[in-house]
UniProtKB/Swiss-Prot annotation:
Gene3D superfamilies: Immunoglobulins (2.60.40.10). One of its GO terms (cellular component) is M band. Residues 9-44 have a biased composition (Basic and acidic residues). The gene is MYBPC2. This is Myosin-binding protein C, fast-type. It comes from the Eukaryota. Residues 1-59 are annotated as: Disordered. It comes from Gallus gallus. The lineage of its organism: Eukaryota, Metazoa, Chordata, Craniata, Vertebrata.
Length: 1132
């Protein structure tokens, strides 16, 4: 057949295109109205109520060209001019803002609106589905279409033109096909296509910018769906290549690292390296230009530019930038803070309602962030009227302006490296009497003053006389000055006598005193009158006793009379008082003698005697002065026991009670090292043992005690030794029995769930008989591990066991075993657990040590015996047996010790045995009778006999060496050969050889070789080459599919490829079939065949492209066919 001309294919292609267009334009037959036409994209049936006269059609365009789609809308029937929007995908609106999209709108005389969308230089990223939406007030309509972009077509019109034939004839049979021209052109074509694809396979600029800014992987799928990108995998590959290929910097050789970290207070260096030392460089911090200073130091070292930041603080934690002209590099500096610790912690405080509370703590760093907690709950700054937070350098304050009862709690300050806790106790405000009123005895016309002092300056009150309120008048004055309340009565009269009471407002408290009126009767006295003391001292001594508080003033006013005026003397025992000044003095008047002690002391207590004398007579009286004081401090204050948050304090009464009975005691406590004491009770405590609660476990405390009597409070006692509230642990858990014998039981347990700050010092194990309550200690000393073997138990008894954990706080509650245990040996059949490596022959070399541990089991303890082949063990073999294993030991192995050793374990009539096969080996002796049996050509046959001594091991092989008799240099020709004969080849002609052989076993080769007695002489002879006839092989074979087609299910609109592999010789002719019909030159299908791999590419398949596809291969030897099913799914 003559070679077809170039024009013929073009004409045929034009005819096919015309026929295809005719088929496409021809209306479908009436009887198949409901079926879709056989096309890739079936035309959409227009909605009869739609606004479109013509809708945009699906378009296929080559990459790099412009494409235009148009839509026509009838505007005559619309209430207003229509407006059109173009979308890619579902939401991406196309507009004039993009440089590659142009929109046009025109109207003709019939009010038909034409809208056009033009995309210039179409790229592969423009492929996808598009939507056109038209609106006119409330009317709305839309339609969809697609744009498919294909690679630019080759300029070659006919592939057959690339083929050449080697023959001179022009028919098909002349010569063989020459593919060289095609391959050369294809190489150029592939390079051009690849270059063109790299240039054209770009995304639109707006999509590309979106893809560059994506941080989450899920965003890629959303963008692809939004902009109609169907080739998601290709998009990701392209984007990955762009990310992997960093842009090479022209200014920087080495840029900054992405991030740096430095500890607070240290310095850090940021280093870049420039390509040119003359380039200008600037440093920025958070966008602000940095200038050289003592903190920021700039250095130039060759091409390196260094920024040094000294004494980094939290303010230096920022983003830094280095600029060289238009190029930049960035980094972040993270300043790491050291953990902030609490240097001085909080202190316990005790206040009353309304007081101002300041909780103060000091931390290790200024400006540190702290957290305040109240009973474990964060104290927020929302309650600004109640809580106030203050910072002063390293000190932090929590201020409560007016304390309330609800503020009583444990307060904690927390930092990232420590914490401190303190207790705040708010009590009801108590009114204290600082100075009580005293009884008064006044004369007529004198002034009476009642005065008292209370603890609160703001407290007011009222005065009463015999239950009737006293009102101010000209003679009666009531005053209130700070803590002092005063009632003054001028010109006292007899009716003013009575009981006076002061009652503070709002308190159930009253202060009382008595006013005695001393009436003076004027009588006629003769000139001579004996002296007389006007005191009634005839009663009991208690009535004549005057009680005074130490430190107060004592004034004994004694009325006297007599004519002439008597002489007054005061005595205490033999001591005579005459002084008129000083701490103790006497004031004398005509009718009154006063004995005054300015500040009473304990030594002033005693009997005082006053004597008055004149010439007429003498009189005397005795007064008892009793000085009372606050008691001495309590003695022997100590802490007797502690708990998790409590401690028991005990003490002894003071040796001196101050002259008044002890009414009770007051207690205080503080944290060790603190200066602030906190009261534990406001009302006196009568006993000498007190339990303090609400303490913090693990914190050291100190306590002290005050004694109280009617006079006041004593000095504090000595502080107790520092103690720590620690609770006993909870009971141990999971108490179980592990083992039991006739007299022992092994108990195991787990540590307590709650241990606390005191830890666990050890455990006690106790046992008792079932039904009894008498517990017997199994161990006298604490055991630290969680297990104990109790020994000396009664055999056959049922016993209960319990475990108690002990720490410095005491014993925990016991954990008792649930069931009683019968103390009797549990019989367990003896069994030897022979290790796996000892179940076969155990091989050791001579001189090595043998140390084998063979475990066994059985209860009670089995009896273990060893024997060697029924006899006793050699003296060199030693055994040691424990409760659970036996040790077989040989210090230095020798060959006579090889053999079978038997181990037996026996319990009563039960027995188990195991055999240990021991073999002690060494190197073998040399082989025997090595001789050359035959010599031919360049070969020699050697033969020998096994060695007499095999080293007590099997001979694993032989090593053969040869040597030329002239040089006697030995060369190994064979190793690990098991037969006792071998052939040595490739010997040099004309030489004479001697051979030697080594024997070999598991220990190695023999010490000495065995040398052959005779030699092998290789004679020189001529060589003859005999050619083997060559038989040509028939390589022809029928076609056979190595990889058949596989059923596929794809989504409509996504390109699919069907692949298979075939072999055969001569090369088979391949035909693709669809539904048993041959696929012609349809541009929708592209078939490829390379090195036996066949592929059929189906572009953008539609629902009607589904069916059965087949591939048929035919050559002169036969035919082969493979088929598959292709299902095309339409997305919902």
């Amino acid at each position: 057949m003559p070679e077809p001309s170039k024009a013929a294919p073009k004409k045929e292609a034009k005819k096919k295109e015309e026929k295809k267009e005719e088929k496409k334009e021809a209306p479908p037959p009436q009887e198949h109205k409901d079926e879709a036409p056989d096309d890739v994209h079936p035309p959409e049936t227009p909605d009869p109520e739609g606004l479109f006269l013509s809708k945009p059609q699906n378009v296929m365009v080559e990459s790099g060209r412009d494409v235009t789609v148009s839509a026509r809308v009838a505007g005559a029937a619309l209430p207003c001019a229509p407006a059109v929007k173009w979308f890619k995908g579902k939401w991406a609106e196309l507009g004039d803002k993009s440089a590659r999209c142009r929109l046009r709108h025109s109207v003709d005389d019939d009010k038909v609106h034409t809208f056009e969308l033009t995309i210039t230089k179409v790229a592969m990223g423009d492929r996808g589905d598009y939507r056109c939406e038209v609106t006119a007030k409330e009317q709305k309509d839309s339609c969809s279409f697609s744009i498919d972009v294909e690679a630019p077509r080759s300029s070659e019109g006919n592939v057959l033109q690339a083929f050449k034939r080697t023959g001179e004839g022009k028919d098909d049979t002349a010569g063989e096909l020459d593919f060289s021209g095609l391959l050369k052109k294809r190489e150029v074509q592939v390079e051009e296509k690849k270059k063109k694809k790299d240039e054209d396979d770009q995304f639109p600029p707006e999509i590309w910018e979106l893809l560059k800014g994506v941080t989450k992987k899920s965003e890629y799928e959303r963008i692809a769906f939004q902009y109609g990108i169907t080739d998601l995998r290709g998009m990701l590959k392209r984007l990955k290549k762009v990310h992997v290929e960093p842009k090479k910097s022209e200014a920087f050789i080495r840029k900054l690292d992405p991030a740096y970290q430095v500890d607070k207070g240290n310095k850090i260096k940021l280093v870049v390296e420039l390509s040119d030392p003359d380039l200008p460089l600037k440093w920025y911090k958070n966008g602000q230009l940095l200038k050289p200073s003592t903190k920021y130091v700039f250095e130039n070292v060759g091409l390196k530019r260094i920024l040094t930041i000294h004494k980094c603080s939290l303010a230096d934690d920022a983003a830094y930038e280095c600029r060289v002209n238009d190029e930049k590099c960035f980094t972040e500096v993270f300043v790491k803070e050291p953990p902030v610790t609490v240097v001085r912690g909080l202190e316990d405080q005790q206040v009353v309602v309304g007081d101002r509370v300041v909780l103060e703590a000091e931390v290790s760093e200024e400006g540190a962030q702290v957290m305040w907690l109240k009973d474990g709950v964060d104290v927020t700054r929302d309650d600004a009227f109640k809580y106030r937070f203050k910072k002063d350098g390293k000190k932090h304050f929590l201020i409560i302006n007016e304390a309330e009862l609800s503020d009583s709690a444990h307060y904690k300050i927390m930092t990232n490296g420590g914490e401190s806790e303190a207790e705040l106790s708010v009590e009801e405000k108590q009114l204290e009497v600082l100075q009580d009123m005293a009884d008064l005895t006044v004369k007529a016309s004198e002034q009476a003053v009642f005065k008292c002092e209370v603890s609160d300056e703001k407290v007011t009150g009222r005065w009463f006389r015999n239950g009737v309120e006293v009102k101010p008048s000209k003679r009666i004055h009531i005053s209130h000055n700070g803590r002092f309340h005063k009632l003054v009565i001028d010109d006292v009269r007899p009716e003013d006598e009575g009981d006076y009471t002061f009652i503070p407002d709002g308190y159930a408290l009253s202060l009382s005193a008595k006013l005695n009126f001393l009436e003076i009767k004027v009588e006629y006295v003769p000139k001579q009158e004996p002296p007389k003391i006007h005191l009634d001292c005839s009663g009991k001594a208690a009535e004549n006793t005057i009680v005074v508080v130490a430190g107060n003033k004592v004034r004994l006013d004694v009325p006297i009379s007599g004519e002439p005026a008597p002489t007054v003397t005061w005595k205490r025992g033999d001591q005579l008082f005459t002084a008129t000044e000083g701490r103790v003095h006497i004031d004398s008047q005509a009718d009154l003698s006063s004995f005054v002690i300015e500040s009473a002391e304990r030594s002033d207590e005693g009997r005082y005697c006053i004597t008055v004398t004149n010439p007429v007579g003498e009189d005397s009286a005795t007064l008892h002065v009793r000085v009372v004081d606050v008691p001495d401090p309590p003695q022997s204050v100590r802490v007797t026991s502690v708990g998790e948050d409590w401690a028991v304090l005990s003490w002894e009464a003071p040796p001196f009670d101050g002259g008044m009975p002890i009414t009770g005691y007051l207690m205080e406590r503080k944290k060790k090292g603190s200066m602030r004491w906190m009261k534990l009770n406001f009302e006196v405590f009568p006993d000498t043992t007190y339990e303090s609660t609400k303490m913090i476990e693990g914190v050291f405390y100190e306590m002290r005690v005050f004694a109280v009597n009617a006079i006041g409070v004593s000095q504090p006692s000595l502080n107790t030794q520092p103690f720590m509230p620690i609770a006993p642990t909870s009971e141990p858990t999971h108490v179980v029995l592990e083992d039991v014998t006739d007299t022992t039981a092994t108990i195991k347990w787990r540590p307590p769930e709650r241990i606390g700050a005191g830890g666990v010092d050890g455990y006690l194990v106790e046992w008792c008989r079932e039904g009894s309550n008498e517990w017997v200690a199994a161990n006298t000393e604490l055991v630290e591990r969680c297990g104990l073997t109790a020994r000396g138990l009664p055999t056959g008894e049922r016993l209960l066991f319990r475990v108690i954990s002990v720490n410095m706080a005491g014993k925990s509650p016991p954990a008792t075993m649930a069931q009683p245990v019968t103390i009797r040996e549990i019989v367990e059949r003896p069994k030897i657990r022979l290790p796996r490596h000892l179940r076969q022959t155990y091989i050791r070399r001579v001189g090595e040590q043998v140390n084998l541990v063979i475990p066994f089991q059985g209860k009670p303890r089995p009896q273990v015996t060893w024997s060697r082949e029924g006899g006793a063990l050699p003296a060199e073999v030693q055994t040691r047996t424990s409760d659970v294993d036996s040790v077989f030991f040989i210090r230095s192995a020798a060959r006579p010790l090889s053999g079978n050793y038997e181990m037996r374990v026996r319990i009563d009539n039960m027995e188990d045995c195991a055999t240990l096969r021991l073999r002690v080996v060494e190197r073998p002796g040399p082989p025997q009778a090595v001789r050359v049996m035959e010599v031919w050509g360049s070969n020699a046959l050697l033969q020998w006999e096994p060695p007499k001594d095999d080293g007590n091991a099997e001979i694993s092989g032989y090593t053969v060496q040869k040597a030329d008799t002239r040089t006697m240099e030995w060369f190994t020709v064979l190793e690990h050969s098991r037969p006792t004969r071998c052939t040595v080849s490739e010997l040099v002609m004309g030489n004479e050889y001697r051979f030697r052989v080594y024997s070999e076993n598991v220990c190695g080769t023999s010490q000495e070789p065995a040398t052959s007695h005779n030699t092998a002489r290789i004679a020189k002879e001529g060589l003859t080459l005999k050619m083997v006839p060559y038989k040509e092989r028939d390589l022809r074979a029928a076609p056979q599919f190595l990889t058949p087609l596989v059923d596929r299910s794809v989504v409509a609109g996504y390109t699919v490829t069907l692949n298979c592999a075939v072999r055969g010789h001569p090369k088979p002719k391949v035909t693709w079939l669809k539904n048993s019909v041959e696929i012609g030159a349809d541009p929708k299908f592209l078939s490829r065949h390379g090195l036996g791999v066949l592929s059929l590419l189906i572009r953008r398949p539609g629902p009607f492209d589904g069916g059965t596809y087949g591939c048929r291969a035919v050559n002169e030897m036969g035919e082969a066919t493979t088929e598959c099913r292709l299902d095309v799914r339409v997305p919902q």
